[in-house]
Amino acid sequence: QTCCGSKVFCC
């Protein structure tokens, strides 16, 4: 699981 963007959501 990798957090994307500003680490608010993970993809």
Swiss-Prot record:
Contains 2 disulfide bonds that can be either 'C1-C3, C2-C4' or 'C1-C4, C2-C3', since these disulfide connectivities have been observed for conotoxins with cysteine framework V (for examples, see AC P0DQQ7 and AC P81755). The modification Cysteine amide is found at C11. It is found in: Secreted. The cysteine framework is V (CC-CC). This is Conotoxin tx5g. Signal peptide: none annotated. GO terms for molecular function: toxin activity. The keyword Transcription does not apply. Keywords: Amidation, Disulfide bond, Secreted, Toxin. Expressed by the venom duct.
